[in-house]
Amino acid sequence: MSTHDPGGIGAGGEHGDEHLASSGRADSSRADLYMPGAVLEEPAIVDVAEVRPELANPDLVDAMVAPDRTVHAKVGEPLLQMQNVTVQFGGLVALNDVTFDIRRGEILGLIGPNGAGKTTAFNAMTGVYRPTQGQVVFDGSPVGKLKRYRITQRGIARTFQNIRLFNEMTALENVVVGSDARHRTSVPGALFRTPRHRREERDAIDRALALLEFVGVGGRATEKARNLSYGDQRRLEIARALATEPKLLCLDEPAAGFNPAEKESLMDLIRHIRDDGYTVLLIEHDMRLVRGVTDRIVVLEFGRVIADGTPDEVTSDPKVIAAYLGVPDSELTADEGGTGPDRAAGPTTEGGSGDATA
């Protein structure tokens, strides 16, 4: 877990436990909220603010959720590097000599038409696929041959295009599960509930409560995941990913199925995550959202990088326009401002469901 304990409300903090003790709740309040393995019909709905009134202070929540600030790294330095990465499935080359980096403290958008290789690149970074050639370097060390849980421990967390939650567990329990990657307690320690295990569990619950408040679902901490709205399930998945204390948060189409108001709210959350000290990789089909929230965009087409730059640079690049509209550069030049059938059709990826290339 992070070494910082702002406000003294972590496992070893005095103020938070004093507040709970004064109301006669102390650790029992955590037990009421978090009972792994318990068979409950439908737990009572409890707002985080009822258990931890301190978390009504957004500055305190931001401090609890922020990554470990004892790590000294400059914003703008490469955090993850794709170095000449090729991923091949039999005769199909899904990624072809792909090179780009993700810099500390930025929101990077990864876009491209269906089948461009976005999901393959995403999976190569997070350990689902191993590169056929080249390497993925994260925080100075190659990670391409590591097992997925080791990559998570190194500091890469992800969400999924299709929501993957533990539906019969509460929102709080789902987030606490995410913190398991940072636990140091042995299996015997957990079985016999040693002081170290209890301390780590208290830490995990406290931070999970802060994360739920941070993403906007603090009022639903004890609701089962299956009972949450679609938008809240998306936010819960982000909270669970943040519970692993990542250096890099990878979001796979987080706005899929959202209405315009929900997308605006999501954009605010993604910026908030970046501003709190995280680095974010975003795959998303909604170009308005991508352009509005990212600091830089990398564009893939047929498994190759065709553009890398600021949102304004990328969206005005003739190669990118041609890739999205499906017309040659020469036709775009000859028909600038025109309204031919391809131009009227708009980007082929709007409303798409993901890469054709897995």
Where do the protein language model's features map onto the residues?
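N-terminal intrinsically disordered, low-complexity tails
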Residues: G10-I45
